[in-house]
Regions:
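Eukaryotic scaffold repeat domains enriched in small/polar residues
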Residues: 20-341
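Bacterial N-terminal signal peptides
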Residues: 6-16
Length: 341
């Protein structure tokens, strides 16, 4: 009976692995111990985002802090539920950026652009905030719901693909070589919005659905050197690829529940994709795939779990260095520094 149960469990686990990923080579890797040195009075919560700048400084946007909620005439005003920390390249704590910001409530992602500006995506305030390297707010996209009624457009979407510069639970941000800004308006609206480098809305594409060009959700996005946009359509278990204007090009179907994407720099770009289940799901899958930009699997590493070299819902990957990754986890409340061999 015990042998039968073990066989059934093994078969079930194999069935959970995406078909195209079952024979992918394993990439050897290590997890660096104590990669981030936190002060005694600071802790990480669920890690929405992790990113590095050109100097190697590390930024972590985490769901921790002390939310402040004030009941207004019609809606609550809330802020402070997430915090943005900076560490130097050796993992030593440097500072907190944007403390008590109006736009910080539920950390979705942090990215650093080619000019070392820091971009924060917040899922609850429906805002994307750009900070300059000194930590000053330089641009805002989206709009938070007002604490009192005002004549304003609603940010709530119905997933129908409406053309709007407002968001409903955005998840990620990326840029092309010309500086155009792409926002994954991923959970409420299931679309990708394009803005000029000055923050002027251009267009959006996508809506709720399962057909080509539609999304169950857009968990993460990345842009390659040619300006193509890659979207992690986790609910539909695929990565979709579009040109710079939102025209569908192709899809990668064998990536499991695609949650986090990261595009490397340089001439020979590769894409990292996390196959992550929600934190309350069973401990299965959890690996990260390394892929060529034509969708071929180069290798994979890691699995679901709580130990070093295991992952608990990877929501963010930083791959400025192709073989030195920072991985932010929701389920394990941590950032791991990984060295790939």
């Amino acid at each position: 009976m015990k042998d039968l149960m073990q066989a059934l469990l093994t078969a079930a686990l194999i069935a959970c692995v995406p078909a195209g990923a079952q024979n992918v080579p394993e990439i050897r890797f290590d997890s660096v111990a104590n990669a981030l040195q936190l002060p005694a009075d600071i802790y990480l919560g669920e890690v929405g985002g992790v990113a590095t700048n050109s100097r190697g400084d590390i930024f972590v946007y985490t769901r921790t802090g002390h939310p402040t909620i004030t009941i207004g005439t019609a809606r609550p005003f809330a802020h402070g539920g997430s915090r943005l920390f900076e560490f130097d390249r050796n993992g030593k704590f440097v500072r907190e950026v944007g403390k008590d910001s109006y736009g910080f409530m539920f950390a979705a992602q942090v990215r650093v652009d080619p000019a070392d500006d820091i971009w924060v995506v917040d899922q609850m305030t429906n805002m994307v905030m750009k900070f300059d390297p000194q930590g000053r707010v330089a641009m805002l996209l989206g709009r938070k719901a007002e604490a009192v009624p005002v004549p304003a457009r609603a940010s709530k979407g119905d997933g129908s693909g409406q053309q709007s510069d407002l968001f409903d639970r955005p998840t990620d941000v990326a840029w092309d070589a010309a500086g155009n800004i792409f926002v994954a308006d991923g959970l409420g609206n299931a679309r990708i919005a394009k803005f000029t480098k000055d923050g002027v809305f251009v267009k959006s594409w996508g809506k709720k659905g399962t057909a080509t060009g539609e999304f169950a959700n857009v968990r993460s996005i990345a842009v390659d050197a040619q300006g193509n946009v890659y979207a992690a359509d986790g609910g539909n278990k695929r990565v979709q690829v579009f040109d710079n204007n939102g025209n569908f090009k192709t899809a990668f179907p064998n990536v499991g529940n695609a949650q986090a994407l990261c595009m490397t720099k340089g001439a020979n770009q590769v894409l990292y994709v996390s196959n992550s289940n929600p934190p309350n799901d069973i401990d299965r899958d959890g690996e990260i795939y390394k892929m060529s930009l034509d969708g071929n699997m180069i290798g994979k590493f890691g699995r679901a779990g709580k130990l070093p070299k295991e992952f608990g819902t990877v929501n963010a990957i930083d791959c400025r260095n192709e073989n030195t990754l920072y991985v932010g986890e929701i389920g394990n409340l941590r950032v791991q520094k990984l060295l790939l061999h």
